[in-house]
């Protein structure tokens, strides 16, 4: 199933992913068009986060059937679409070198790796 999801993501037409600031310097990620297969209803949810480094941003979660995605602004200039992957605890999403791992109201964004494990994550909390 996960292999099929990765193949799906390679073919998913993400026409526009926009990232913009607001008055309180919070970044917002938004997907304007994303085609996912199946007849299930698309469930979307936006969650605001504030991180230990002071950064504020909004993550958009998209769920449809077996497909779960998170649109995360990983930096001031880059927003990525993450795919849900297997985790022992919480919800774990991957995009390239990045991991977005949530559990309850807490989340961590990892961008560096050592020995096959993510390191130096930035901890964030829902606001």
UniProtKB/Swiss-Prot annotation:
The record marks 89, 103 as: Directly involved in lysozyme active site inhibition. A lipid is attached at residue 19 (S-diacylglycerol cysteine). Gene3D superfamilies: 2.40.128.200. It is a lipid-anchor. It is found in: Cell outer membrane. Disulfide bonds join 51-124. GO terms for cellular component: cell outer membrane. Pfam families: MliC. A lipid is attached at residue 19 (N-palmitoyl cysteine). Changing residue 103 to A: Significantly reduced inhibitory activity. It comes from the Bacteria. Keywords: Cell outer membrane, Disulfide bond, Lipoprotein, Membrane, Palmitate, Signal. Residues 1-18 form the signal peptide. NCBIfam families: PRK13792.1. Specifically inhibits C-type lysozymes. Homodimer. Belongs to the MliC family. Type 2 subfamily. This is Membrane-bound lysozyme inhibitor of C-type lysozyme. It comes from Pseudomonas aeruginosa (strain ATCC 15692 / DSM 22644 / CIP 104116 / JCM 14847 / LMG 12228 / 1C / PRS 101 / PAO1). The lineage of its organism: Bacteria, Pseudomonadati, Pseudomonadota, Gammaproteobacteria, Pseudomonadales.
